[in-house]
Amino acid sequence: MTRLLLALLLVWSAQPALALDIKDPALAPVEETSKILGGVQAAPGAWPWIAALLYANDSNVFSAQFCSGVLIDKSWVLTAAHCVQGMSAQGIQVAVGAWDLTKFTGSRTPVRSIRIHPQFSSTSLYNDIALVELSVPSSIQPITLFSGESVDNTPPSLLGKLVTVLGWGVADSTTSWYYPEILRQVSLPVVADSTCNDIYINPVLPSQFCAGYWEGKDACEGDSGGPAVVQVDGHWVHAGIVSAGVSCQEYFGWYGKYTRTSAYLSFIRQYAPYVAVTGKIPAGGTLPAVNLLLLTP
């Protein structure tokens, strides 16, 4: 119940700042706190670098979780700037490798510092990226970042490819606000920027991408700050950060905006210079199609 009430407050407080990003006021309000709808439970241990961001003053991991992130270096977690804006390092703990929030027995690692992108805009959610420094290095293997480059230096296109999004967000908003204890995943196609620009006032920048379904797919993003990952050479790499979406309704699936990881490698390397980066793919600039779990209507 604590988490339910907290979630409703977060959704309500997020709406005014972003409501103007929707071209048609009759459309559902934009919200920063995103959801996984129509996805499936993730297998235990499948995504070891996933991280749950927790309120430090709440001893219950399930109710304390407010955003997600990923371990990209032994001491650094990548997340969305809007997740940690206005928060102190002392107010956050991180559960790396969490799966079932009600049965998490690992360490709740205190945070040493928070690094928000200096050009982050809380209204447009441009540059929605931040780094959280752990006070104790993690023993878990970090995820590799997608470089967004090909062997011939032609930027590869994510358009039409499936990204897998992870989180503990709302699993059902049609009849009730149901937050799952267990990590969930969903596969979403990356769509053309113009498709999202038909909905949002603030256009999709090159430092972002748009993904999701339309009409009847119950498709939303994962928890804010969580990862959108793709496969490169058989390995999962981090391609985007869950940033902004619109409220999910019973018969509508909405496209969400993601911060494009490859656009911020310089920012990331300021603090995590040895982060692993990959993504050199064959000439032609395309990623292989991946047979992933699809949403059900």
Locate predicted features.
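Sec-dependent N-terminal signal peptides
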Residues: 4-13
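C-terminal subregion of chymotrypsin/trypsin-like serine protease catalytic domains
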Residues: 20, 51, 65-85, 92-93, ...
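Conserved H-D interstitial segment of serine endopeptidase catalytic domains
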Residues: 24, 29, 53-56, 77-80, ...
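Chymotrypsin/trypsin-fold serine protease catalytic domain
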Residues: 24-28, 102-104, 109, 129-215, ...
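Active-site region of chymotrypsin-like
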Residues: 47-61, 137-145, 189-224, 237-247, ...
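Solvent-exposed loop/turn segments at secondary-structure junctions
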Residues: 58, 83-85, 100-101, 121-123, ...
